[in-house]
Design a protein with these regions (language model features):
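Active-site-proximal segment of RNA-dependent polymerases
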Residues: 84, 88-146
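Short, hydrophobic/amphipathic alpha-helical patches that form generic packing surfaces
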Residues: 12-13, 85-89, 168
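An acidic intrinsically disordered interaction segment
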Residues: 40-59, 165-170
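Conserved polymerase palm-domain catalytic core
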Residues: 124-182
């Protein structure tokens, strides 16, 4: 595992996303950025020693278009966000052969693909005899069986420690004390 490269790529992506969204850089982010190389080295050491621990995550509610609220569980720390992004990039690279097998029909959660690509493909294959079905499965991610997910990962050559981190990441310690509408 090249945690060094994964973490630096995650940091660059994280910082670029914050800047592109026009977000005000918050003090905690400035603090991290001032000595990011040292902070990334500390995270990397924990990952290499296989003793990285996620911190508490926070629960928040975000408004939905229909007037309701969608609960989100998000990491509090930049470190946790960078480790998760590193894992995501590692999985994308490790499982790209699976994505390639459905590349002409699947557009979700894949590097280099976006909603526009899906719409272009849809326009290309659309004819009056086809039916377009748009669905939203309520609580989809809540219904994923986490044990089955981990068992599926066992079928592929995924680093065992990464699987351990994934398990910890899908079963975080959650702080509900500040649950409020955002």
């Amino acid at each position: 595992m090249n945690w060094h490269k994964l973490l630096h790529n995650a940091w660059n992506s994280f910082l670029k996303k914050k800047k592109n969204n026009g977000e005000v850089i918050m003090p905690y982010l400035n603090s991290f950025a001032e000595n990011y190389k040292t902070r990334l080295a500390v995270i990397e050491r924990h990952l290499q020693r296989k003793d990285y621990n996620f911190g508490k995550w926070k629960a928040i509610l975000i408004p939905k278009k229909d007037g309701g609220n969608r609960p989100l569980i998000i990491p509090n720390s930049i470190s946790d966000k960078l480790v998760l992004k590193s894992i995501s990039d590692y999985l994308s690279d490790s499982l790209c052969h699976l994505f390639n097998s459905v590349s002409s029909i699947s557009y979700a959660y894949q590097k280099g693909k976006c909603t526009r690509d899906a719409l272009v493909q849809l326009k290309r294959i659309h004819n009056p005899e086809n039916i377009l079905l748009k669905i939203d499965i309520k609580h989809f991610f809540d219904e994923i069986d986490k044990i089955i997910l981990i068992q599926l990962l066992d079928q592929y050559q995924i680093d065992d420690y990464v699987k351990h981190l994934i398990y910890k990441g899908i079963n975080p310690v959650i702080d509900y004390s500040n649950l409020k509408k955002k």
